[in-house]
Amino acid sequence: MKKMMLAAALAATSVLAVSAADVYVSISTGKKKNAGTKEAPLKNLWHALQKVENGDTIHLAEGIYPGNAKCNWFLIDKAVSIIGGYSPDFSARNPLKHRTMFQPLNENNDKKGNGLGIFTIQFDMSKPAPKGVNMVFDGLIFDDGQAQSYHPVKGKPEGVETGMWLEPPAKGNTQFPSAKRYLVYSATANRAEGDITFKNCLFLNAGNIAVNLNWYKGKVKMENNVFCNNLMVGANVYSSNPKPGEVEWEFEKNTVLFTWSRTSELSDMGFGVRTTGNVKSELEDNIIGLSVLTGWDNTKGNDKTKKIEAEGNVFFLNRGSDAQVTKSPSVVKVAVDDFEDDLEGNYGIEKASENVGLADPKAFNGRINTAFLNAFLSMKYSEKASLDAGKLNAFRQAVGLPQQGTIVSKVDMFGNRYPLEDALKLFGAMAGKGAQEIK
């Protein structure tokens, strides 16, 4: 009986692979009752996701795509691919010209449902986990800046379009607090086997980790993406498999800039990328800079379960360090010039060669928002404590309790919204390093 069930499952998988379909969606020209062809596209991505099967590919024309009932997120519960950047009639594809965008609005933050990310990848647990998957997400723009809430005046440097990002439940002049969610999230419980790829995408203004991916077995590839102005971490991959090496992560030719700390105290997290235990990681030809704490964090997980290669990357102006590792009981901060000597052969890092600082800052002339950059480089956090010396504190001190007082804190900026148009200019900033122009 078990053999029959296994054969049936394998047969079903092969049939899906053979009969994989292409579905076309256009927010501007499509209709719900259309067939989903180039000539008669569907209107909404969420509707297409309900109709497709494992192995299918959804092609998205330009436009801003809302979730079901404008809920700001999409459930991806099948092993499908989503390709964006098409003209409305699907006659041409250019992701930077024909922008396929996920740009939720703050006014819809009350319609979150249970999605932890704008894209929440969570396979149907009532069915066998998909095997041999090859999911591709290509040419998509994720910008959560319009769903956040910013202080109207505090932490607003000259020339920067918003004040500082506000941690919920605080809010500025918006209907709801900030959307503290991932841009892409894959659930820990997922047991899919195969490959998943993100390429030619922009991940911008996240109120949490931009891409937080859990994978069970296979290859995770992130290539030619821009991660800009996100909180906590630009990208990390976790293995939900107890066996080391079952998950491989290739992080190649990405640009990761302006990664903020977890809170406005600027002291916790703020990693461009993070490598973790049980994952074989390759970091190659990336640009990683302007992180609040460190460009590359390697303190998560058991070093003995890691196999990491970091080669040909460019690190610059990371405020705390270019990399950090755990040397119990301390965290060691390492500058890029010392990677080969201090990191290679230690901490699960097999290769750490040809990584350099930014030789020519002119590469970013006209590519980076100068007001935002100047404010970030000048940023500081300060606090002033003022204790009440009255009878209450005298009594508390006498019985060994801490005194109470007030703390006034000030930060020059924190997670302020970065302009979309400037973020798109980061594609192609440096030949051969970081995200290249999309062809």
Feature locations, PLM:
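Right-handed parallel beta-helix
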Residues: 84, 133-146, 163-172, 193-207, ...
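Right-handed parallel beta-helix/beta-spiral solenoid domain characteristic of secreted/periplasmic
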Residues: 80-162, 168, 172
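Acidic, glycine- and Ser/Thr-rich low-complexity intrinsically disordered tracts
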Residues: 91-100, 302-439
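N-terminal extracellular ligand-recognition/capping segment immediately after the signal peptide
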Residues: 46-49, 54-92
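Right-handed parallel beta-helix/beta-solenoid
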Residues: 17-47, 64
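Positively charged n-region of N-terminal signal peptides that target proteins for export
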Residues: 1-4
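Short glycine/acidic-rich loop motifs that flank beta-strands on beta-rich extracellular proteins
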Residues: 69-71, 92, 106-107, 112-116, ...
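Hydrophobic h-region of N-terminal signal peptides that target proteins for export
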Residues: 10-18
